Amino acid sequence: MLTINETRLLNRIHALGAVGIDADGRRTRLAASDEDKAGRDLVSRWMREAGLTVVTDYIGNLFGIWTPEGCAETEPVMTGSHIDTVINAGQFDGCYGVLAALEVVETLKASGFVPARPIAVVAFTNEEGVRYAPDMLGSLVYAGGYPLEQALATVGTDGAVLGKELKRIGYAGTVAPGFLKPCAFVEAHIEQGPILETEGITIGAVEDLQGISWQRITIEGEQNHAGTTPTVYRADAGLAAAKVMTFLRSRCELPGSRTVATTGCIAFEPNAINVIPGKAVFTVDVRNPDAAQLCAEEQALADYLTELEKTDRVKITTERLSRFAPVLFDEGIVRLVEDSAAARSLSCRRMTSGAGQDAQMLARICPTAMIFVPSVRGISHNPLELTHDADVAAGANVLLDVVAQLAAK
């Protein structure tokens, strides 16, 4: 049975992981930054050394394309992920999917395999969304879900315009996003959660992806003295915010619920120890893999906020920041993942992706699925992020099988 070169793949993961380390030892490659350029340059070099045609589109998505003779007009199989990172990141998130994809192509080429269609390795721009919003921007533009000009005009957290930054680092591209129309997309990725490791399973066949609803909620009460204002007379914006958070947790704990909810950002005004908050501003991240259930959670929150205004004598306004519907991946490709795992005697289970991924955007335009490998202790977006070498190789070998079967058709 054909297998990837584990040593080469691991060496590349570590080499790319060494790019963007600052003086404090923190790994950060924000989209379109100098550090991102250095990572792109390295991956581009590896693509060229593998004999691939390297192309960048106008949003900065980077492609390495293998086009065997006679199939240039055939829709390609596409595989990859992203190489931009969060601040103080691990070395596997996204990078594993890009480098596993490159390893798959090199292995297939060396084996004498002749695909019936091109195979394209891709590193999408700004998946993390740390510097530029929204996240998964490169794949979203590629799939036609966001206007190119609007994306290029996006202003980053540092005031830099994305289009200008892509030009500055030399990755503004020469072709329009969507120039390749894939017949299928497969993304290998670390799980970024604890399920596979906890259950002792090597491969996750990802069958769907949670819908995501982001809101910013502003609660206005009455700023007042913490010592002289009796509880009954208070319009405490801080307390009202806390009630919203506990309400969301209670929804997650309902029997059979698949909802998860997070308040990741919060600010009180005036933010003083002896002053009742007159204002609270916080974010809400609600996720569920079922479209109807996600809508139900959004409505339940809206109803609760309406009631809370009355009971706590506060004014509440909401702002939608982002919303992505749940995604159901292609059953045929999910089965290919399961079949490959079985053929290689690897334990496997079907899974839901709890995180947003580039694959959810590609699912808009072609059959798509994902392959998960275990994350040690479920840790990600953290320098402690780790996937064991054997699992790295196992996931890449499953990707090898799936890509080969899709490209042979």
Regions found by a protein language model. Name each.
Residues 3-89:
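Acidic/His- and Gly-rich active-site-bordering loop/insert found
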Residues 9-22, 80-81, 348-398, 406:
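Zn-dependent metallopeptidase/amidohydrolase metal-coordination segment
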Residues 29-31, 262-271, 283-290, 315-334, ...:
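A short beta-alpha structural unit
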Residues 57, 114-118, 173-177, 228, ...:
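Flexible, glycine/charged-enriched surface loops at secondary-structure junctions
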Residues 60, 83-85, 119-130, 192, ...:
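Acidic, glycine-rich active-site loops and adjacent beta-strand->loop/helix elements
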Residues 79, 88-128, 213-219, 225-251, ...:
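Alpha-helical metal-binding/catalytic segments enriched in His/Glu/Asp
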Residues 127, 131-291:
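Midchain, well-structured core segments that form catalytic/ion-binding scaffolds
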Residues 207, 225, 229-255, 300-301, ...:
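His/Asp/Glu-rich mid-to-C-terminal helical/loop segments that flank catalytic regions of hydrolases
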